[in-house]
Amino acid sequence: NANGEYQVETRKGWDELTFSAVGYISKTVRVGSNNQTVNVKLAPDNVLLNEVIVKPQKEKYSRKNNPAVEFMKKVIEHKKAQVLEVNEYYQYDKYEKMKMSINDLTPEKLEKGIYKKYSFLRDQVEVSETTNKLILPISVQETSSQTIYRKNPENKKTIIKGKNSNGIEEFFSTGDMLGTVLKDVFADINIYDDDIRLLQQRFVSPIGNNAISFYKYYLMDTLMVNKRECVHLTFVPQNSQDFGFTGHLYVLNDSTYAVQKCTMNLPKKTGVNFVNRMDIVQQYEQLPNGNWVLADDDMTVDLSWNSNKTAGGLQVERTTKYSNYKFDPIEQRLFRLKGSVIKEADMLSKSDEYWASVRQVPLTKKESSMDVFVNRLEQIPGFKYIIFGAKALIENFVETGSKGHPSKVDIGPINTMISSNYIDGTRFRLSGMTTAHFHKHWFLNGYGAYGLKDERWKYSGTVTYSFNKRDYVVWEFPKHYLSASYSYDVMSPMDKFLFTDKDNIFLSVKTTTVDQMSYMRDATINYELETLTGFGVKAMLRHRNDEPTGKLEYLRNDAAQTRVHDVTTSEASLTLRYAPGESFVNSKQRRVPVSLDAPIFTLTHAMGFKGVLGGDYNFNRTEASVWKRFWLPASWGKIDCSVKAGAEWNTVPFPLLILPEANLSYITQRETFNLINNMEFLNDRYASMSLSYDMNGKLFNRIPLIKNLKWREMFRVRALWGTLTDKNNPFKSNNPDLFRFPTRDGKFTSFVMDPKVPYIEGSVGIYNIFKLLHVEYVHRFTYRDNPGINKNGIRFMVLMVF
């Protein structure tokens, strides 16, 4: 191995061993017939070699009549027999250690700068067991779990028995974010799947159903692996910049064609970002019943911003050991536990004795003393200010506590403290929220804002009771709470479609003037429940007063065009949501899905009550939506698909009609229309569709010069079908309860769609520019004669992906 350790099994008549290595003088030693330890040191061979440049001829690879390809077809054909799911039941134990370290350290670096000034940093340095390089561990996380499976009816659950973490994540209140993201990015690998989910991407498995067309295979040798005869093959992607691996397969040379060992790496010219090196080693073992199962799954990844490592980097090591495979019937009560992942109540408080019993790989000396290292870090002068700034930047909030006295109140979001809009002008806002250190069940949040232009105060306050104890914020999964809120603020109709806060300073710059707004006074009671299966219910009661302002007026559809000062509604709504397998990272501002692989189904119905608490209208609105991501085979990228439909069943004025999901900022956002103006189309029946195709660089990777930039391409199309029935159309009805459509300077700014002509916009984008920037050109294909519209535009987004 990398440490020079070896083991050789001798046979009768063998009495000598010869040791050789490139650049060293060979040495022969005598050995006996008994077990013995032989340590050998080779002397360097100081021979100066002349430079030789080898330029291979371009390879002509053919799948036809290729023995390696024919052999791999048999491996793929037999792989179903090796998956655990062929058994009626199975269970196994799993131990995982995830370590993050600063890498690329050298003896020279350790004698300079901060390492020279603080000796405890040098004391924390160790040699990586996988790369043989100097590293400085900064985080270690251990997880002990048990997985159980039942075939009929199919059910699979993972029971987390213990979790243990030490390191820099202790400095962050949402420290579980690091562990959650690391586990998702460096996920478990099953080469028997067609695609391997890794780095939040999909890689083609070397034994996947599409592998023959994606990889080149080469037969190398027949050799013994763990006393079993195996066929050794190597594989490389047809195009090294596609999302695939290079590596070695060791397949049993018998009728099972089972994989006994697999090593995988990323190609040197890979299109993957931030990864300079990745080593994956999997070992399989045979059980007494003949099954071959995964025993070891180890991964080492070197990360840095650029490939030449001038900025330094990190190393992530994931060590995973599987044991105690069993195929006996399992107690049925375990399958009745809620959720696919069950966390034992004492998983965070397991004893040292417990970890010693389940830890199949001992901690290194530096890993064991991680808590001491963290304490020494805190003693560095000025370190707390560095952490304070880093937390404010990453979490977008400022804490009011300290390590000994955790924050009970956080100030933020920081990016909403100053913004601007047409009514407020320059707007200043101060926001805050209590945390679980204030109370595990009761939470408060709110803000106060002031606009220099309209000289009005705006405010919002919310009181929430969580039925579940929370660790830090109220929206941790699964949510179960009751809240009451009251707010008074200025809003545009499209603000409700934003995924982020409407006062985000980066959204202040619009592609067109948004001058049709309202002062909204809301009183809301909200109940929300989520289950571990991904099912959620949200029930809401809301009383709203809507006072138009700016260039927005409410004029009755009568001869006098009577001005309406405001509209009051009293409504109740119920939303059902189902997203099986969805997982989240908790930030202080909101929950963020770890990945977007889970399908999402929603159904909402809202009812308005005329005469209840001053409500002006009855209304009934129903909306449904489906969102799904589809990964294409053979590294052809992914398609995100969204379909929505809805209807307003009653006669209502235009503020209560259904608006398109418009986004008039320069920041692109999923599922919104970039070129539809504020309230441009008013419908009481609609259907919309969004398709986004991310090719992951499949085209650019085949264009000379361009492929060196590692740019990636994407295509998007969005469509909206809508209609307005005569009863809600002020141009076809004399009903005075309706309002005239909005105008600006005497010209209408809202329109009725032709039910036979959908609104369509498309975009072509390039992302991964400098590994950071997403640029998208958007074009409007229909309704191009509407006044005041943009027919095309450029949109941006900061996007970091592997």
At which residue positions do the language-model features occur?
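Structured extracytoplasmic
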Residues: 46, 58-230, 236-244, 306-419, ...
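Short, solvent-exposed aromatic-acidic interface loops
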Residues: 264-270, 298-306, 486-487, 645-648
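Periplasm-facing N-terminal accessory domains of Gram-negative outer-membrane beta-barrel systems
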Residues: 1-51
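Extended non-globular scaffold/tether segments
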Residues: 273, 284-293, 303, 318, ...
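Short, hydrophobic/aromatic-rich segments at coil-to-beta transitions
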Residues: 89, 226-234, 258-263, 291-296, ...
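Extended lipid/amphipathic-ligand handling interfaces
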Residues: 247-253, 279-289
